[in-house]
């Protein structure tokens, strides 16, 4: 995994074939640029044979949280497991190098199965139908899956902190 700057992401967009993933990458780039996240939280890229094939856009804060915004596989590279490999590398980095303890994420219903395979659980649905979560983050998929199994068996052990639950409620989330 490596960090990439806005120039590299623009190059990837320019050189990618048109399609939904290129459009998604372009939107992620615009968001990152608008929020000035390239300076403090550059996207992490996963490479296959020296070629960037997947990117993760996430931020880290001092409270031990990571906020995951986007995971995008480049157009034409889908179906090779790159997003999963990128995710595996990212969670290891987040926990072991950034000392991340918890993950905040919002995802669309179409991506729930992918996130479920990675051991994530969701606690709220916003008015647009996106699912929201605030949960512990572990350095491996196996540990994340084990945590999810425990959470399913005893949901009280996995409730988000009261501050997160209060935020979900204040935003009118189900």
PLM segments and residue spans:
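Conserved acetyl-CoA-binding loop-helix of GNAT-fold acetyltransferases
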Residues: 79-93
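Conserved beta-strand in the GNAT
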Residues: 51-59, 67-72
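Short hydrophobic/aromatic beta-strand element in the GNAT-like acyltransferase core
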Residues: 40-45, 55, 70, 104
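Intrinsically disordered, low-complexity, positively biased terminal segments
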Residues: 92, 98-100, 147, 153-174
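A short beta-loop-alpha structural element at the N-terminal edge
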Residues: 1-14
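Residue-level recognition of the GNAT/N-acetyltransferase active site
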Residues: 74, 78, 108
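Active-site rim helix/loop that mediates acceptor-substrate recognition in acyltransferases
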Residues: 20-43, 57
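Conserved active-site alpha-helix within GNAT-family acetyltransferase domains
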Residues: 99, 108-132
């Amino acid at each position: 995994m490596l960090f990439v700057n806005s120039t590299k992401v623009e190059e990837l967009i320019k050189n990618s074939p048109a399609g939904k993933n290129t459009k998604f990458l372009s939107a992620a780039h615009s968001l990152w640029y608008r929020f000035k996240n390239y300076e403090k939280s550059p996207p992490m890229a996963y490479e296959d044979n020296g070629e960037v094939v997947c990117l993760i856009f996430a931020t880290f804060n001092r409270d031990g949280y990571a906020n995951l915004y986007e995971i995008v596989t480049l157009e034409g590279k889908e179906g090779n497991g790159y997003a999963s490999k990128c995710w595996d590398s990212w969670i290891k980095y987040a926990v072991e190098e950034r000392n991340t303890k918890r993950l905040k994420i919002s995802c669309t219903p179409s991506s729930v199965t992918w996130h479920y395979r990675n051991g994530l659980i969701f606690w709220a649905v916003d008015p647009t139908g996106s699912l929201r979560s605030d949960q512990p983050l572990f350095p491996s998929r196996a540990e994340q899956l084990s945590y999810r199994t425990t959470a399913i068996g005893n949901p009280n052990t996995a409730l988000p902190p009261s501050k997160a639950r209060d935020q979900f409620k204040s935003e009118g989330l189900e």
